[in-house]
Amino acid sequence: MSSFILAIDQGTTSTRAILFNEEAKLVHYHHVEITQYFPQGGWVEHDPEEIWDSTLLCCRNVLEEASLRAADIAALGISNQRETTILWDRHTGQPLYRAIGWQDRRTVNFCEQLASQAGVLAKFVEKTGLILDPYFSCSKIKWILDNIKGAYEKAKRGELAFGTVDSYLLWKFTGGKCHATDATNASRTGLFNINQQRWDDELLTLFDIPKSLLPTVLDNCAQFGFTDLDLLGHKIPITAMIGDQQAAAVGQACIKPGMVKSTYGTGCFMLLNTGDQIIHSRNRLLATIAYRLNDTVTYGLEGSIFIAGAAVKWLRDPLHLIEKANDSESMASSVEDTGGVYLVPAFTGLGAPYWDPNARGALFGLTRNTQREHIVRAALEAVCYQSKDLVRAILNDGANLTTLRVDGGMAANNWLLQFLSDILGVNVDRSRCIESSALGTAFLAGLGAGLFDSLEEMTGLWQADRHFIPQMDPKKQEELYDGWQKAVEKTLTPAAPLLFP
């Protein structure tokens, strides 16, 4: 009997295929790094074919390494980097352009011009829960249609398909038989009305995007189709799709209102479960869909940080201050403090709660005594300060936060999580399975395949690996955070047209 679940976690810098058993225990995983392209300042792209090739390779390798066959897999689920935008030809399956990444800022001017038009901003926020920012898919689609020769005409004729990465992978897995997405990914496009749960004709007109481009929107657990026989040697049912951050919230068992998770990967994403209530933030957070099951929507309040683990990669690759990412932990702990150094990693602008697309990274407080260890520590501390920015915004929106559940690649760093607990002044719990996105995806896929009965079972499956308790004096905490706020203030650009009404 088929009893294993295959979860795809397609991220910004790598693709993973993770096998879980019927008890949602991790059995084996395989990962492949993928390339990011930076053709101009503020531009971030991927090769869609590389994304697909890496996904298929991971699936084949993880099965081989675990001595399993595709026939042993009861269900497949897909989680993905959100907002990243792909357009492809419906007949040939060929991408029209590279995938424009979620970090890409090329549409800043367009978004600012649109936001300056009377009534546009308030309407956009009310319908989508988002802000009018290059982060989301709508302006990326618009850019491709306007800048790739013949794209708009082909779209009008119904010859092109749009998808976030989940939708593109589904198309490839099913041999073009299924063009669909899920409610969480749809909610990150800027074209989906989260109140009415449908593509919004008024928003499509605003961005001049033909509706024929768009995929069908399904629940997170649904019958999305089957993998083509030729791909893995057996047709595997695809029973779940979900954006990676929402998948992590499920994997962290944040299924009750008031529960919060934070994922530390390339960026950092903090998500608060708000139940059946849409909370329009007064503090520049995003209202979004946490998950949709049986046509019932659970909403979330999210803060997005563009640069977290990417700052460590920056220390490693162009700067060569570290050899390996995990060297950052020992280097940060080897000095008592940063020596007054603050890094504001606004390499692609600043996300929540500032939403300044034109801000750029800066190092402050350098002296002749500054060592590379101080800079490395400042990079890790910056992740924690940005997290405090988000926590303050969540608290100011009326939420109560006593414990934060964390996951992602950076969550393996004990020093980082202790400093995070110290600077936030709250308990931080690290999940035993730091692959929370994959776990949440696997659980939903199993739910869709009938291996699990209800979402509540996830609560019993979640286990903490380690608890981090605040140890810093509150006065010291305030002093350090005040220095961060002053550093951020120096990087912010003159006010552009407001992105919130």
From Swiss-Prot:
Pathway: Polyol metabolism; glycerol degradation via glycerol kinase pathway; sn-glycerol 3-phosphate from glycerol: step 1/1. It catalyses: glycerol + ATP = sn-glycerol 3-phosphate + ADP + H(+). ADP binds at T12, R16, T266, G309, G409, N413. It comes from the Bacteria. One of its GO terms (molecular function) is ATP binding. Disulfide bonds: none annotated. GO terms for cellular component: cytosol. Inhibited by fructose 1,6-bisphosphate (FBP). GO terms for biological process: glycerol catabolic process; glycerol metabolic process; glycerol-3-phosphate metabolic process. Its EC number is 2.7.1.30. Sn-glycerol 3-phosphate binds at T12, R82, E83, Y135, D244. Pfam families: FGGY_C, FGGY_N. ATP binds at T12, T13, S14, T266, G309, G409. Keywords: ATP-binding, Glycerol metabolism, Kinase, Nucleotide-binding, Transferase. Glycerol binds at R82, E83, Y135, D244, Q245. InterPro entries: ATPase_NBD, Carb_kinase_FGGY, Carb_kinase_FGGY_CS, FGGY_C, FGGY_N, Glycerol_kin. The keyword DNA repair does not apply. The keyword Transferase applies. Key enzyme in the regulation of glycerol uptake and metabolism. Catalyzes the phosphorylation of glycerol to yield sn-glycerol 3-phosphate. Belongs to the FGGY kinase family. HAMAP family: Glycerol_kin. This is Glycerol kinase. The lineage of its organism: Bacteria, Pseudomonadati, Pseudomonadota, Gammaproteobacteria, Legionellales.
